[in-house]
């Protein structure tokens, strides 16, 4: 019996040892080798892309990868790629592209390797693509409606300077003066070439407002000193049909969320909106005709930034127009623009150069559509503007290029500029000489005001920004204006 127990014990021990051996063999099985496979690329083979919108080629793989620093070229020139900022399984290759050019990107063996095993290389990669040819810019030789000698001469002056110099301008802090232009002169020794006046308070009852728009002396004095006049209009409307407009300018707004005023109804006879729309245009027209009689022409930028955020690809509560004139969509906006254009023409206004303001892609073509469906048409404006705040010189170039390509027969101008909101140092407007050298050759720029700026000009750029701009050979100042 004892022998039997010993024998069974030995058999059990043998079985256990055998199982242990089997387990050891299992642990010694080699790990499958790492392989790298390209899963996707942001530019397809043979694609035709827009140079301004294509700055990166992203290659996505099946595993985590890293770049080694060599072996990636664009048309034979080495480029420095880097890991994608959102995933370790992709690589971004920077692209500096020109219009109308064929390109070849090559990724050599060992240029991209496995993070886990750097001896494992991504497969060699070659991509052929091209950029779209730049549309030929054919600026119209004459304005769409302006026919006074002063207006035709001013338009010709802008056209001749376009691409040669950028015309400087400053906003008159929504007042009827040129006090900020005086501050720029005190700081730099030069006046901006153009001063912008806003009809924002013209709805205040006659005789009760702090601005007497019928007194055009602040405008004629500027023009007689050699300056160019720009006019714009924050078109305020009553908050409701029964709202009384206060002597202090209260009771009105531009925001569609603060008024019952309907942009569509402004085009329908018999509505209170229609009556108000035309009554306010009559007020502005009276002032413009006084300037016309005095031999003064002006640029005219009404209904600016119409699209607001309405072109966002993914709609949300905030993706809408921020001014009432855009609240009912692009078709109504275009009808409003044309109604104003035709009414001004009917009333004999012939001294204005019309500027339409685009939102372009709101600076992000992946999130916004371009607002070309808001464009009133080539017969209804002379220039296309873009308002930019906190944009670098490189970003200015991208915006300028996109707009010029979209509207090649119009002069492209920087309608407003300055720092981004309250961020005076973190997101300033790019220096104008830098914008110019990058290729953003705006027809003119207009710096917005800020009474709390804490600088010598009360504008949304620094004193050094103004000094840099007004001393640049590419920036036109008032003493250089001749037309």
Question: Residues of each region from the PLM?
Answer:
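N-terminal module-boundary/linker segments of secreted carbohydrate-active enzymes
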Residues: 131-200, 205, 209-212, 433, ...
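Aromatic-lined carbohydrate-recognition surfaces of secreted/lumenal glycan-active proteins
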Residues: 169-171, 301-304, 337-369, 411-422
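Extracytoplasmic/surface-exposed domains of secreted proteins
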Residues: 53-72, 88-125
